[in-house]
C-alpha cells in the first residue's frame, strides 16, 4: 500500500495471531464492500498491526491524506514505478472531481443502501465478448496494480472471513460469478444464487470462486445447414417447443410469477436471473413527480410530469445588477494592444517575453520583445505582399486565416498571432488535426468554412507531422474546406522594406480574432472578439490582478484560447511581463514541472487548472526543496467548477510548508463568450479567507439556494470566484425562457455587460442575438436599462459581499423530470464510489438523451483492461445506488467501454457530444452495460383498466342508430356461377385424376425443376395415375392397410409426393404430408416428424430410400426412439402391379387428408379436410384465378400444409393447368432460379412464400443489372401471390416490387393470400376485381382494440394492406371475441369465416383441450336470424367498405388482417402484436438481422440476431430499449443478443416465438449477451 510504512510480508501475516488475522480479513471485506472509507480502513488496520510491526520509518501525515492519488497517464512512468505510485485505489483520480467530503458522503449513502441491498441479476456474457484490451493498447493513468502478495493476502482474508460465524456480509457473495475456463455459454455466464442461508452456503460460494467448471456445450439447435456461412438463413425448420408440443393459449395461466416456464425447471440459470430482476422491480419505486400521465381516450398527455407541489421555491427579492469597480484610467495605457508590442519591441528589445520548454521541462527558447516585434512585422509584410501577385493579393485586411500550431510551440504561435494582428487579418486558432476523422473535426471544418478560411498558417515541424496521402499531399480532413498551407518559420519570411510600416489604429469594434467554442450538441461556433474588447480585457485583467512590468508568469493552460491566451499572450505584452509556457506534454512526463518553474524563476503569478494542482501533489515528494513563496497569485481558472474547492484546499495544505500563501489562491470563472466573468483578487496577508457556501443538492436541482440542513451526504460545498471584473456589470437571469432577473436565492445564468466580452458568433446572426444582445427584464416584463448583456453559459448566484459563486455550466445541465442536475456533480459522485480496479478516473462522461418525453441520464466510463466482470458489475450497481441516494435521480444507462476508446478532445479530455452521438447511433461498443429504465421511466401512461363491456345487442343497435353497417364481407356466390365443366360431375379428386388419365393422358400436369433450372421430372395425367396405382397396390400388399388408415408421406418437395398422395386416395388411406427431417440437423427437426407420426396415429410411413436410411440411422437414434417407427415403405422401386379396384368413399363428407402444421406459438395442430372441402377449395381457387388446361403457373413454396399443399398437389389435377414446381431450397443454390423460370416460360401467375420473396429481395438486391444482362424480364407476370397465414408484410412486398420494377415487374402484380388453420384459403387476389387497397391505422388505438384510420405519415401509424380478395363461396364476419357479437364496419374483432371448404375439425390437438370444436362451428350470440355456422380463424382484423366496385358490381368490402390472437402480448392492459415491436427494433441498428419478442412473467424479452461483430452486441441494448419505449410505451425487461439464424423460422417464413422462448428459458441459445434491464 502507498505509505503504509512497512507492508507486512505474507510470512509475517501468517505469523500473526489467528484472531488478528480474522479481524484483518474482516476489515478488508468491509473496505471492499464500502462499509468503511479508505481512511477508516487505514486507521483501524494500523491500530491492529501496531503491536506487531517495527516502528514505521516515515510518518508523513500529509502523504497519508493524499495516498490515493496517482498521476495521469504517462509512458515514462510505466517503466519506473516509484513506491508512492502503488496505491490501493488503482487509479489516477481526475482531480476536478476530488473531494474527501464527497467521497465520505457517497460511502455513507452506499452503506445506508447496503442495509436494503437487492441482488441484481448480473448480465450474461459469452466469453469472447469480454473486453480483451491489450495492455499496450492503452496508456494506463497509473501503474498501481496492487502487489501480488497483497492479492494473495486478500484471498486468504476473504476465506478466513467466511469462516467467521459472524457473517454480516452474506450478500457480498450473492451474484459472484463462477467463471469457468470453458467457452460454453453455461460456463461463461453467471450462476446467481438467492439469498444465502447460513455459513455453509456462503462457504460453498467462496470455494465456487476458485473452482473451474467444465460444462459441455448444449446441442446446437440452430446451425441447420452446413452452408450457413452463406448470407442466407439456415434452412427453415418447423420446431415445436422443447421436444413436446405445447399449446399455450390465453386460457392457460401464463403470468403466474414463477410458473415452471413451460416445462423448463425453474432453477434454470435464466429463470433465476429473471426472478432476481422481478424481485428488484418489486421494490417500491420513488413516486414520480405526478403519479402518471392520464390516458385521455387515446392521447397520452405528452409532456413532462407536473412539478411537485412541495418543491422549494425562491423566496428572496428580485436581484439588482452588480457593478464591478470602475476601470482605472492609466495615462500610459496604449491605444491598442499592437501599440504596446510596438513600444516594447522598439524600446525594450532585450526583455524576455515568452519562454518555451522542451519535453523534459527545460527552457529551450526565449522570445524577446524585440524578436517578437521584428518577426511579427516580417510575417505581416509577407502575408499582405508575398503570397499572391501585386494586383491579386491572396490576403486582404479583414480576411480570416487559421492558425494551426501544436500546444508545445507557444513561440511560433505568438509570432503568427501578432503577425496577423499587424497585417489586420483575423486569426482563428484551432487544434492540430491528428487524423482525417478526428473527434469533432468535422465541426471544426464547418467553422473554417463558415469563416471563409482558405489559408492556414503553421510551422515547418507541424506541417511535416500532418497526416499525408500516398503521394505526400496533406490529406483532405473530413468536412474541411480546401486549405493552402503557409509555413511561418523565419527563413521563409520576407524582410519588409525600410519604408513599410504596419497600420496600427486605435482599438475599435472591428474584429481582432476568433476563438472557437464547442456547444453542448457538438457544433463549433466562432466567438468574434473585437480589438477594443481585446484591449479592454487586458486592462481589466491588469487592474484586477495588479500586474506590473517585468513580472514572471508561469502558464500551464492552453495558450491558444481562454485564460491562457488572455493572460499569457495579451496581458503579458500589455505589461511587458515574461511568460513561461508549460505545455501539456511536459506535464504528462513531469507533473511537477510548473512548480519547479515557479521556484526557479521566482514567478509572481501562475495560471493553472485543478488538474495541475493535483498532479503536482502526486509528484511533490520528488522534490523537497521547491519554494512557492514568490507567488502572489495562483490563478485557478476552473474555479468555476464546483469541485475545485477541495483541490485548492488539498494543494494549500500540502504546499503551505513550501511557502504558498493562503491568500494567493485566486479562483476565477471564464467563458468563451463573456471572457473573464469574475476573479478573486490577490488577498492581503493575514486577512481571513472568504467563506464557503454549503448548499443543498436537492435545492439546487430546483434552482434555488438553500443552506444544506438535511442529510449532509447531499450537500455541495462551493467557493467563490471573487468579484465582477473592473468596469463590468453582472446579473443573474432565468436559464430558460425570457431573460428575467432571478431572485436573490435563485440559481440562474450569469450575464455580464462590459466592453471586455465577445461581440458575436461569426456568421450566425440568430444565435448571436440570443447570447450577445440580451436585455434582462423584471418579473413584470419591463426591460432593465438598455445596456445589452452577454450570456456566460455559467450557472450561479451573487452571494453576500457581491461575491460570485458558480455551481455549474449551462452545457452540463441535465433537465430530468423538471429538475436540473449538473453533469459534473454526477461524475463526482460516480468517482467517489471507490472504483478499486474498475475505471479510469479521468475518463468518464455524463450526458442526457431524450427518451419518451423526458431527458434520461447516461453515464459512460472507460474500464481498466484488468477489471473483472464481477468488479465492474459491483461498481456499476453501487454507482447507481450512490447517484440515486445523493441526487435523487435515476441513471437510465451506465456503460463501460474498453480503455482508450472514448473520443478525445485535443487536450485529452472526453469529447462528450461525440460520445453521445456514438451512443445514439450504436457505435460506442461498450463492454459492460446496465440499463435501469424501470427506475427512471415514471411517466408511462396508466395501465388500461378493462371497462365492463357493452353487450353485443347494444353494440348492434348502436351501429344501426349510427347508420353503420355490420362488418361482413363475402366472395362471389358459387351457386350463381355457371360452369359447363365436366369436372363438376365428379365429387372426388381421385375420380377427376382417373377421368383426366383417360380423356387427356399425355397432358403434362407437373414439371419439377432443379437448381440449374432444368426439368428433372414431369408427370402427365396418365403417368401420375399409373404411379398412384402402383403406390396404392404397395400400401395394400406391403403395408396391409385398410381404408381409413392414416399414412405419413415423407418426401422432399416434388412429384413423388404428389403421386404418393393420390396413391393413398386410391387405396382409401388418409395421407398426412410431413416435411422430411434435415440431415444436418436431426436433433431439431426429427422430433417434429416423430410427433406428427405419433399424433396422427399413422399406420405406415411412405418415403424414399435415402430418407428411410436416415430415419433408422444412429444419428436419428440420438434424437428419437427409432425402434418404434410404424412400418416404413420406400417407393423408389415399385412393382408393376395395380389394385384390382380403386377405393371410392361412400360420401363426400369422408376424410380426404390431414393437414398438420406447427403454429407460430409452437403448437402442432392437425385439421381434417373432407372430400367435399377439397373439391370446394379447388373450385374456388380455379374460379378466382381463372385456371384451365392451357394455363401454366409457377409455384415456389413448401408443399406440406395449408394453401401451399393445395396448390402443389391438388389444384392442377382439378383444373388441368400445368404447374411448374420449384422447391424453395433450390433457391439457396441459385437465387435466380424462380425469376429466371418465370421469365423462361413467360408465366403469368406465380405463387411463393415470404421466405422466397425475402431471399430474392435480400440476395438479388444489388444484382438487378445482372438480371438484365441475363435477359430476365418480369413483364409477363400478371399476379405474383405470396401464400401466408399472417398480416401482409407490406414493406417486404413494396421492396420486392420496387426492386424488380426495373426488369418489368408491374407494381400491381404482387399480392397476398390469407388463410388460417380452420380454413386454408379465405382470401386470394385472383385475376379480376380491384387492386388490393391499403390503409394507415393508428397503433395506439390498435392496442386498445380499436381501429382509427389516419393519414400517411401520421406519427405512430401502421400501414396495412388488404389480404387479396375473398374467395367465391366464402363469407366473413368480424366478431367481438369476448361477447361473440358482430361489430361494425372498420371495427377490430376476430375474423369468423363460413365456407364449403372450411376444415371439418381438429384431428387431435396435442396437449391442449382449450381449442374445442366450437372453433369450427359456432354461432353469433346476436343478430343472425339465419343461425349460420361460423369457424373462428383466431385472427384479429376488420372489414372496411371501399369506394371501389367489386366484380359483382357492388361496392367492394376489403378485409384487413391485423394478426393472430394467440400471438398477441397483453402488457399494461393493452394488446400488442409482436411484429409491431419487432419492426421497430429491426430498424434501430444496421447490425440487427432478425428479431423476436415474447413475454415471460410480465417481462418483455427482446431477442435480436447480431449480424455484425460481437463488439457491437452491447450497442444494441440501449437502442432496443429506447425504441420500444418511444414507440410502444413499454419497458423492455431483458435484451438477448444472439448469433444470426438463432430465431427459429418455419417454412412459411414465420417466427416461432414460443420455441425461442423455451430455448431461452432452458438456456440453449448460447447468447452473445443477455442484459437484464433494472
From Swiss-Prot:
Disruption phenotype: Excessive axonal outgrowth and branching with decreased dendritic outgrowth. Reduced acetylation of alpha-tubulin. PROSITE patterns: DMAP1_BIND (PS51912). Its main location: other. Residues 52-62 have a biased composition (Polar residues). It is found in: Cell projection, Dendrite; Cell projection, Axon; Perikaryon. Keywords: Cell projection, Neurogenesis, Phosphoprotein. It comes from the Eukaryota. Belongs to the DIP2 family. This is Disco-interacting protein 2 homolog B. The lineage of its organism: Eukaryota, Metazoa, Chordata, Craniata, Vertebrata.
